[in-house]
Every structure is written in structure tokens, then in C-alpha cells.
């Protein structure tokens, strides 16, 4: 009682009947680290720290006949979209990609998300401005526009359909930057139109 009398202090916490739910954004738990993403024609994808990229004096390692199709500045909180010739897309949170040195070969995307043997990457982009529209192009001249936000998913362990294709068709590109589209046929004819004419 003597101790309580001499050292008692008012309670600093409040006791309440109800429990307040605390919702955490999983994305906020991921360290925000700047990095470089390298994508190759054969489907190799790697994440490189900005330091490794800036200090490297060697070219990135590639398999014979392979070449780099895209190189992005990104954050570990971003996601990478990869589109395949079979009309599918892969949603790849960048933080799940192992960090390697710029000169290293990296891993084939099938080590992260399983794709078919005949499936190959035809386009790639970093998912940032989800209000943008993506235009998909097929070998047979089919076009389709989709809002980037529609590609965001919570489960990404397998490829998902971006566009439904006929058996003899395949996806050849996906692009967000074009205001106009120019199609050229194998017999030398071409068709030019504005992307706002695409449904």
C-alpha cells in the first residue's frame, strides 16, 4: 500500500468493450526497393537491384540466340504483366522474383509460373497506372481493348486468359502507348485506324 501510495500514476490506456479491427495492406508490408526488371525473348525474367545495374560493366548473360525484349525501372511493390502467344497473361508480383546480379542469366518464367512448352512471351509491361487501356493484337487481325485494372488478381499461380483465340490464331502484341494502329498484311496491304475505334 505504501508503494502504491507513493508511486501510483494515472492509467495511460483505455479499457473498452468493443474490439477495433485493424486492417493491414499486404502491399505496405513489402519493402519499397527500386530495381530493374529484364525480360528476354526466350522467357527469362530477372530482378536486379539498381546498385548492381548501375555498377555492372558487363552485359547481361543470355542463352545463345536469345535477346532482351524489355528493360524496366520498377519497385518491388509493382507487378509485372507478361502476355503469351496463346492469349494468356501472367501476373507476377515483382517481390517474388529472386534478386540476381545484372550479369547473371536469371530464371525462366516457368520456374515462377508454369506455362506450356509451346507458350512464349510476346509482350511485357509494369502494372502501374491501372486507369490506362491495353490494346491486344492477334496474328489474324483481331484487336481488343482492356483496362489495365482488369488484369490485377490476388491468385497468380497459373496463367489466365487475356483474350479468347481461335485455334489458328495467336496473340502477337499488347500495348498501352498507341493512339493509332497500323496493320500490314503479308501481301503488302495495310489498314490504319485510331484505337478509340476498337471496342
Predicted features and spans:
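Short, structured "edge-of-domain" segments at secondary-structure transitions
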Residues: 1-199
Amino acid at each position: 500500500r505504501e508503494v502504491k501510495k507513493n508511486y501510483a500514476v494515472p492509467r495511460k490506456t483505455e479499457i473498452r468493450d468493443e474490439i477495433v479491427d485493424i486492417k493491414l495492406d499486404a502491399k505496405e508490408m513489402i519493402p519499397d526497393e527500386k530495381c530493374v526488371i529484364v525480360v528476354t525473348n526466350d522467357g527469362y525474367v530477372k530482378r536486379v537491384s539498381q546498385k548492381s545495374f548501375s555498377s555492372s560493366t558487363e552485359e547481361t548473360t543470355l542463352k545463345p540466340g536469345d535477346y532482351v525484349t524489355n528493360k524496366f525501372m520498377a519497385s518491388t511493390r509493382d507487378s509485372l504483366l507478361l502476355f503469351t502467344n496463346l492469349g494468356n497473361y501472367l501476373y507476377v508480383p515483382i517481390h517474388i522474383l529472386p534478386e540476381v546480379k545484372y550479369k547473371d542469366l536469371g530464371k525462366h518464367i516457368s520456374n515462377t509460373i508454369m506455362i506450356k512448352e509451346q507458350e512464349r512471351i510476346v509482350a511485357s509491361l509494369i502494372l502501374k497506372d491501372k486507369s490506362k487501356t491495353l490494346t491486344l493484337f492477334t496474328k489474324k487481325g483481331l484487336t481488343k481493348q482492356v483496362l489495365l485494372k482488369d488484369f490485377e488478381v490476388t491468385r497468380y499461380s497459373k496463367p489466365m486468359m487475356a483474350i479468347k483465340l481461335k485455334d489458328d490464331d495467336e496473340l502477337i502484341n499488347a500495348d498501352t502507348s498507341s493512339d493509332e494502329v497500323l496493320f500490314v498484311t503479308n501481301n503488302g496491304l495495310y489498314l490504319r485506324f485510331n484505337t478509340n475505334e476498337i471496342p
